[in-house]
Amino acid sequence: MAMSKQKFTKAEKKAYAKKRNQEDADRWFNQLEQAIVNNELPWQKPWAAGTASIPTNLVTKKRYRGTNPISLMIGALVEGWTDLRFGTRQQLYDAKMSTKGLMDGDGHLIRFFKQIPYEVENDDGEIEKKVRYYVQYSEVFCVEQCQNYEPPKHKHKPVPESEMMKFFNKFIEDQGITLERKGSRAFYSSKKDYIGLPSHESFTDSLGEVMTAFHEAGHATGHKDRLNRPLGNGFGSADYAFEELIAEMSSMLTVLSLGGDFVPDLVNEEGANNQAYLKNWLQACKDRDNALSLAFSDAQKASDFILESIEGVDEE
């Protein structure tokens, strides 16, 4: 006699979905927190454009966005992957990639917003259409986890540093930011909407010039007439570390999106200090999951803002 399938009430299904979503959220955050503790952060590691770029969906060819590029790059660093193409189990199966041996939990979680349309009656008795958003998680796997994985035969050459600086200058011109090339210090002044960079000859490495330029461009996106982030925070404060975190992540996302190499050691001499501030900031956060999500989201917005001034990019 066949066993009847167990039926669940609507309330039980809702409770299970809520429990599973919270478990996924905890797992997502724990991966990021552990990376911070172990100094395994993607904006602190070098990435070569020819082998590793922005995490991309294997099937749609679109770049992941929001908090997902950072969290997937963290997973790649921990596991030692350099091919940053990902897909769901079904997508890998459809692409003839062997998922044999891969268990639930072996992949990495991406998070995205789902929309639920609904209607409400306003004070005038009229029906208004509204949309409710909620966070949902999905597990994706790196192509290198597949048994029949083969490295790509053709690797893209990184865009020359001279071309990358043209992109930077285009952003500066489009936004009306004042740029001066003098002195020995790189900085952004939100009061004057001004970027100061040492002269081209002052840089011992041309890639260092690119990285420094886009780091300061990341800060410039926070101006009140752009993305309006709190700027001008005191050195060593949690808010200072938070803004530095945004600038470092946005610089990495922008440079890799434009096809360049990323070498963080060339950007910031205060990396170790910022790491300590970041840990303290994270520990002080009452809602650490949302705090990290906000940092990653702000970095993505900063990078998107720069890229939209330069070129159109296809993302998901």
Residue positions per predicted region:
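N-terminal accessory/interface modules of nucleic-acid-binding and processing proteins
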Residues: A2-E316
